[in-house]
Amino acid sequence: MSDNVGLNTPRGSGTSGYVQRNLAHIKPRDYGAPYPKDLDSLRHKQRQPDKGILEHDRKREVEVKVFDLRDKLEEEEVDEDEIDKRCDELRQKLLAEMNLGRRGGGPKKSFKQHQVHEMADAKIKESERLRKALKISADYEEGGHWKRQEERLRSALEKEDNDEEERGKVSPPRD
C-alpha cells in the first residue's frame, strides 16, 4: 500500500487489497462552462412554448371526446355508419371551435408538472395582459430609462468639451 490509498490491511475484507482506477468515472472538463460570463445573458428570458406540442394536445382533447362519443354509441348498439357519421360531425364541430379560439371552461389555472408548454403559453398571455393593463409599450426594454439618461449625460459632456475647444480656438492664450 502506498500514499494512503486503499485499505490499511486487506485482512477480513474479503479482497486482495489491490486498488484499481475507476475507468467509468468521467472528469468534468470545464467547471464553469454551462454558466455564461456576461451579465446580459443572466437576465431572465421568457420560455417560448412549442406551438406543435400545444396544437397536438388540443387535437388530442378533441379525439378523446370523439372516442367517448364512439364508446357511448357502441354501448347503445347504434349502426356503425351512424357512429362514424356522428363522430365525424363532432370532430368537425370541435376542430372548428378550436380554430376560432373558443375553448370551454375559460383559462386553465392549474397545470400538471409535465405541462411545461401550456404553463409557458399561459405565462406569456398573463404577461401580455399585465403589460396592456399597465400600458407598457410592446417594444419596452428593461433598463431603457437608465440608458437614455446615460446617453443624455454623455452628450452633455461632449457638448461641454466642444464648447471648451471652441473657446480655446477663439481666444488665443495670453502671455
From Swiss-Prot:
Biased composition (Basic and acidic residues): 37-55, 115-126, 144-159, 166-175
Basic residues compositional bias, start-end: 105-114
Region of interest (Disordered), residue spans: 25-55, 98-126, 144-175
GO biological process: mRNA processing; RNA splicing
Annotated keywords: Coiled coil, Cytoplasm, mRNA processing, mRNA splicing, Nucleus, Spliceosome
Record-level GO cellular component terms: cytoplasm; spliceosomal complex
Domain CWF21 per the UniProt entry, residue ranges: 54-97
Keyword Phosphoprotein included in the entry's annotation: no
Family annotation (PANTHER family): SERINE/ARGININE REPETITIVE MATRIX 2 (PTHR36562), SERINE_ARGININE REPETITIVE MATRIX 2 (PTHR36562:SF5)
Known partners and oligomeric status: Associates with the NTC complex (or PRP19-associated complex). The NTC complex associates with the spliceosome after the release of the U1 and U4 snRNAs and forms the CWC spliceosome subcomplex reminiscent of a late-stage spliceosome.
Family to which this protein belongs: Belongs to the CWC21 family.
Protein name per Swiss-Prot or TrEMBL: Pre-mRNA-splicing factor CWC21
Source species: Gibberella zeae (strain ATCC MYA-4620 / CBS 123657 / FGSC 9075 / NRRL 31084 / PH-1)
